[in-house]
């Protein structure tokens, strides 16, 4: 829980700044190059790129810097600084903050562009950087630009959030003649803004992409833009399995989800997004994966993607920083345009803080608009219908701040923890190139007591690799970075059996609590690491990495079975990342265990509907975009028959 702290005085600020600069130069120091290696690469420091000046330490990082300052960290020689950082990363109260700072520093060091749009380290990593320039202009959705410090708007329906769920509901209701206002916390991005730079990604993600569950147990990624996560996701379009749909019908009361009626919602979504496999081109990182699967006789399939027919795989690889081609059929290019044509309005840069309720019914929302120039305004939207579609983290937070939704708000959070195992191969993979995700295997889908994981390859870029590698010392980290071009990264995405929760801190902001405590989930985590390592070994990897701290690694010539046993026995908390936050305001028949009824309307407040992945009763067991959109369309149809008086 975040605590209120007194702002540091000038002397404390100066000491923190000096300590932070030395932390950065300890993480990325000047070291002697190995024989035959590029001298400038090994000599360059974080200070040479001004990394410390870019950082804005939060309270936890400030406490870490104060503790290091009390130890005289800034005046110690490099070996002592290195040993202290390594020790504190492994144990003690500051370990989560230090690991987070380490990832932030290393990620920035290998991604920060200069005035020419390039990073000085890229050439020595074999990384080409951007492969094309953005278009000079691109089509934009018209957005409201209200003036003054008090803004009042009215609508039939206020949709909070514009991602996979909110966009569908906005388009459907606007198409049926409702006055719809979409309120989005993020800004609008277009292909003209997408420079194919990792450094730009912070503005497209919730909390800049630097976000973890309490205690650093799992990293969290969620979109924050007009179009939500669909703007920056990897375009994986998978239908929910039949067994999931059957369970939602039988155990949670969503009877129609197991019928042909829901098939129609799925088909409509796929058609609007132009979901297809014809434009899927197997990416370099997928090649050793499918080779190993073939050798083991395990099935895999091409991933269906929401792309235009003119999608060019040669220009792909940067989807997580936006699609410069405009080929990705994200909701800002599909459903939000449909909504706009039907008269919907859009207000961006607005953080909704509370839902207005009177007499047990919705009356609108209040929030804060922050303009590009930094000026702010208090926004009040009067609307008898409110759709909460702010994502699996912010949707329950808004309900909690509003004091509505019942006892299940924030509970039952599923995160689809992804466990990464990477192989270093004797040839160049160049995993940053090609379409981000092109192949999936369901071979381990039910690996443990009805739970399991999907096997998928992912993209790899300097920032991501630098931030995830286990740091032992500055010289070793630089040596590992030099292997970047030969790395094939894969992950096992678990459909979690246990759950976490979303609560509020003292300032009313969302805090995610999650532990890898469920026995089934712990078994799946071990299986994911073991099976991915086996596949890398079969595919001919010379080294196999995980993201454990301290590291777990296998090198050619070592006993692989011993490595496999170590993976099986390891503690896997603190290792995974989550790009899918689900179920935290779920639908169901029982108000004690669900937030909304089986159609999506809150049990306790008329006119407030859940319209995003938070509404899912449990994990959908696959990448959730298509399921989210189909459920949203289903909810929109239910809303169309609803008559809520103003």
PLM region spans:
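FAD cofactor-binding and catalytic pocket of flavoenzymes
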Residues: 2-3, 7-10, 233, 251, ...
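Flexible, low-complexity segments enriched for small/polar residues
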Residues: 5-110
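C-terminal lid/capping helical subdomain adjacent to the catalytic/cofactor pocket in oxidative enzymes
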Residues: 53-54, 123-151, 176, 403-404, ...
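Rossmann-like flavin
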Residues: 78-98, 226, 230-313, 492, ...
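Conserved redox-cofactor binding core of oxidoreductases
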Residues: 108-145, 255-354, 362, 543-574
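N-terminal Rossmann-like FAD-binding beta1-loop-alpha1 element of flavoenzymes
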Residues: 155-182
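Glycine-rich loop(s) and the adjacent beta-strand/alpha-helix scaffold that form part
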Residues: 172-181, 186-198, 219, 225, ...
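N-terminal FAD cofactor-binding segment of flavoenzymes
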Residues: 178, 185-243, 285-294
């Amino acid at each position: 829980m975040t605590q209120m702290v007194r702002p540091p005085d000038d002397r404390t600020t100066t000491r923190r700044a000096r300590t932070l600069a030395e932390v950065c130069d300890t993480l990325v120091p000047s070291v002697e190059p190995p024989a035959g290696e590029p001298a400038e690469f090994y000599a360059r420091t974080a200070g040479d790129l001004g990394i410390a000046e870019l950082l804005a330490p939060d309270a936890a990082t400030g406490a870490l810097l104060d503790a290091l300052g009390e130890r005289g960290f800034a005046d110690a020689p490099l070996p002592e600084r290195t040993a202290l950082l390594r020790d504190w990363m492994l144990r003690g109260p500051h370990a989560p903050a230090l690991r987070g700072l380490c990832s932030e520093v290393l990620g920035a060091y290998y991604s920060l562009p200069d005035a020419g749009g390039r990073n000085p380290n890229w050439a020595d990593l074999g990384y080409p950087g951007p492969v094309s320039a953005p278009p000079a202009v691109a089509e934009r959705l018209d957005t409201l630009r209200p003036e003054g410090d008090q803004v009042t708007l009215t609508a039939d329906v206020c949709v909070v959030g514009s991602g996979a769920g909110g966009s569908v509901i906005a388009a459907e209701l606007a198409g049926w003649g409702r006055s719809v206002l979409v309120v989005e916390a993020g800004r609008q991005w277009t292909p003209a803004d997408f420079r194919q730079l990792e450094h730009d990604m912070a503005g497209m993600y919730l909390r800049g992409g630097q976000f973890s569950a309490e205690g650093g147990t799992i990293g969290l990624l969620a979109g924050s833009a007009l179009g939500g996560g669909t703007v920056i996701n990897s375009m994986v379009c998978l239908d929910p399995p039949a067994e999931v749909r059957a369970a939602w019908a039988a155990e949670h009361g969503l009877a129609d989800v197991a019928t042909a009626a829901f098939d129609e919602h799925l088909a409509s979504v796929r058609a609007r997004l132009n979901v297809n496999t014809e434009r899927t081109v197997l990416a370099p990182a997928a090649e050793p994966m499918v080779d190993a699967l073939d050798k083991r006789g395990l099935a895999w399939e091409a991933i269906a993607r929401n792309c235009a027919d003119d999608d060019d795989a040669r220009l792909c690889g940067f989807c997580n920083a936006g699609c410069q081609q405009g080929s990705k059929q994200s909701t800002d290019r599909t459903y939000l345009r449909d909504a706009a044509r039907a008269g919907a309005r859009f207000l961006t840069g607005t953080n909704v803080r509370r839902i207005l309720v009177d007499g047990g019914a919705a009356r609108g929302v209040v929030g804060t608009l922050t303009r590009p120039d930094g000026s702010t305004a208090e926004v009040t939207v009067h609307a008898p219908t409110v759709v909460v579609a702010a994502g699996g983290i912010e949707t329950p937070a808004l309900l909690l701040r509003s004091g509505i939704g019942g006892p299940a708000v924030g509970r039952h959070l599923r995160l689809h923890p992804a466990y990464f195992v990477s192989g270093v191969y004797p040839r160049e993979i160049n995993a940053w190139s090609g379409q981000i995700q092109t192949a999936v295997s369901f071979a381990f889908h039910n690996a443990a007591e009805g739970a399991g994981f999907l096997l998928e390859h992912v993209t790899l870029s300097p920032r991501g690799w630098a931030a995830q590698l286990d740091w032992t010392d500055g010289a070793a980290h630089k040596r590992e970075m030099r292997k970047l071009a030969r790395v094939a990264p894969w992950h096992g995405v678990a459909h979690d059996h246990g759950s976490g929760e979303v609560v509020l801190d003292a300032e009313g902001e969302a805090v995610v609590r999650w532990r890898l405590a469920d026995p089934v989930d712990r078994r799946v985590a071990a299986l994911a690491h073991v099976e991915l390592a086996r596949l890398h070994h079969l595919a001919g990897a010379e080294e196999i990495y995980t993201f454990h701290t301290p590291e777990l690694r296998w090198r050619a010539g070592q006993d692989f079975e011993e490595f496999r046993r170590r993976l099986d026995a390891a503690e896997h908390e603190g290792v995974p990342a989550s790009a899918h936050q689900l179920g935290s305001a779920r639908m169901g028949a029982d108000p004690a265990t669900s937030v909304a009824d089986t159609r999506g309307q809150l049990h306790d407040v008329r006119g407030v509907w859940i319209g995003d992945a938070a509404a899912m009763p449990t994990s959908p067991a696959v990448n959730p975009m298509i399921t989210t959109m189909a459920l949203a369309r289903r909810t929109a149809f239910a809303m169309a028959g609803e008559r809520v008086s103003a």
